[in-house]
């Protein structure tokens, strides 16, 4: 019988899913294919990965408040799709805090986990798109890095087709977002800039693949470490884990993603979908995470509701090859070559723990440096582990930037931590709470944090700027973007 705390976690997850569509009637406020910024110029395919095709300065919109970063830019850049031989393009958003360190860059990976164009990080920062509550959470955890003075680059790592679950593509696009950011002369980044990455859940798909592909695809990048948790390292394993659960809509989103970028998968899927299946994929292409989950809970991909082959729907050589290609850790040459910090709840209800643990073990056998923390308490789930693990993940990256050596080899440890027990969290408690409360408004920079009361103005920054913190209803008004568009 579930405990009261287990029921509380379930109620909390459902509350978040139900709450944000109510906030986010701005979810219908789509980016729009007619936005000229997202259209690449002629001959873009002849450019090199990481080459900037276009850029603009933006006034970033933040869902929970106005964070007074010093500058923000968006870059359209050349990248790759499923292989290095398939040209593609996408966008990254750069956030520059006050007194930014010009020799440090952090790539932040958002758990978009959906296929609608309004769900991308760039749409969130440009249009204040509130339709993806996970973006709201990730935005909050990025505060720790910005507060430290780290410049952040946050790619639309699902590409223009918003191909959720196409992990290799996400890895290429993330590595090329780093290249593009380093190429952006306005930042004046040092030639020896050190780089790290942070992400969770869908963001860990991205960084798991970026860390795996970096040695062969982008060996020149001075990446010093990665932190990611709740890692969906095996696509088929994740599908089987959430099939028939309240999170089963994620399966349709993932099928939509790989269908839209793998032509051979698209060809097969079209032969097995029924009308409800085609409708489901089209719904996913136009909506964000919580809308998809609320539309398709407790569904089984192996039933005949969406397709005509039942439990044999994935019993196809092409599909099986794709699942193999999208499993981390099975190819020795795709092993991270810098330290990695991973964390995962043993009882994760969305992403299977065993798959992530197996990937970490495989990487270790091939010479990686992996520090893996298991949160074993039976009350620790996917969302609570994201919060609890965010501070150790940040400390791991900060220690690397501060020159702390990471011991050779791998280290697997278990913590019987319960998030709501402050004595267990110890010193982490205030930092976690501050990071979450920070969403209500603060000046971002290493000189110190100022939490602003709602509807107040805090003045006196070095740059002469001020921080306005709005009430919730004020923050969620759509404001015309003030941006400068330049061709590279």
UniProtKB/Swiss-Prot annotation:
Listed GO biological process terms: lipid catabolic process
Region (Disordered) location: 461-488
Name this protein carries in UniProt: Secreted triacylglycerol lipase LIP1
GO terms for cellular component: extracellular region
Domain of life: Eukaryota
Cellular location(s): Secreted
pH dependence text: Optimum pH is 5.8.
């Amino acid at each position: 019988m579930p405990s009261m705390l287990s029921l509380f976690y379930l109620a909390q997850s459902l509350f978040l899913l139900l709450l944000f569509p109510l906030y986010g009637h701005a979810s219908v406020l789509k980016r729009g294919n007619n936005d000229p910024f997202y259209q690449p110029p002629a001959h873009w395919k002849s450019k090199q990965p990481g080459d900037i095709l276009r850029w603009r300065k933006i006034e970033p919109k933040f869902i929970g408040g106005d964070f007074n970063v010093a500058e923000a830019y968006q870059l359209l850049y050349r990248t790759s799709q499923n292989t290095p031989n398939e040209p593609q393009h996408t966008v990254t958003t750069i956030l520059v805090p006050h007194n930014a360190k010009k020799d440090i860059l952090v790539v932040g990976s958002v758990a978009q986990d959906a296929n609608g164009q309004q769900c991308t990080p760039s749409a969130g920062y440009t249009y204040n798109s509130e339709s993806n509550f996970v973006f709201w959470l990730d935005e909050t955890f990025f505060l720790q890095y910005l507060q430290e003075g780290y410049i952040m680059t946050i790619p639309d790592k699902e590409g223009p087709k918003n191909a959720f679950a196409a992990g290799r593509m996400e890895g290429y696009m993330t590595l090329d977002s780093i290249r593009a950011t380093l190429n952006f002369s306005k930042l004046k980044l040092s030639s020896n800039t050190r780089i790290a990455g942070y992400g969770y859940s869908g963001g860990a798909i991205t960084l798991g693949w970026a860390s795996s592909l970096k040695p062969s695809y982008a060996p020149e990048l001075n990446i010093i470490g990665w932190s990611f948790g709740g890692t969906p390292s095996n696509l088929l394993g994740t599908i089987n884990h959430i099939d028939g659960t309240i999170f089963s809509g994620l399966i349709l989103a993932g099928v939509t993603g790989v269908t839209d970028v793998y032509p051979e998968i698209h060809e097969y899927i079209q032969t097995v979908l029924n009308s409800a299946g085609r409708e489901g994929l089209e719904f996913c292409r136009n909506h964000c995470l919580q809308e998809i989950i609320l539309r398709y809970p407790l569904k089984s991909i192996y039933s005949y509701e969406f397709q005509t082959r039942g439990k044999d729907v994935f019993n196809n050589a092409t599909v099986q090859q794709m699942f193999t290609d999208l499993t981390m850790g099975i190819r020795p040459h795709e092993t991270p070559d810098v330290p990695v910090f991973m964390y995962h709840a043993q009882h994760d209800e969305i992403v299977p723990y065993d798959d992530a643990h197996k990937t970490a073990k495989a990487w270790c056998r091939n010479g990686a440096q992996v520090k893996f923390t298991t949160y074993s308490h039976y009350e620790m789930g996917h969302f609570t582990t994201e919060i609890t693990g965010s501070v150790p993940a940040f400390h791991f990256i900060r220690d690397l930037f501060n020159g702390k050596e990471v011991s050779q080899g791998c280290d697997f440890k278990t913590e019987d931590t319960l998030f709501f027990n402050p004595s267990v969290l110890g010193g982490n408690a205030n930092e976690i709470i501050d990071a979450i409360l920070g969403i209500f408004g603060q000046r971002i920079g290493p000189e110190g944090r100022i939490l602003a009361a709602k509807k107040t103005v805090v003045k006196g920054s070095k740059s002469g700027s001020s921080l306005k913190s709005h009430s919730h209803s004020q923050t969620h008004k759509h404001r015309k973007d003030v941006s400068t568009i330049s061709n590279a």
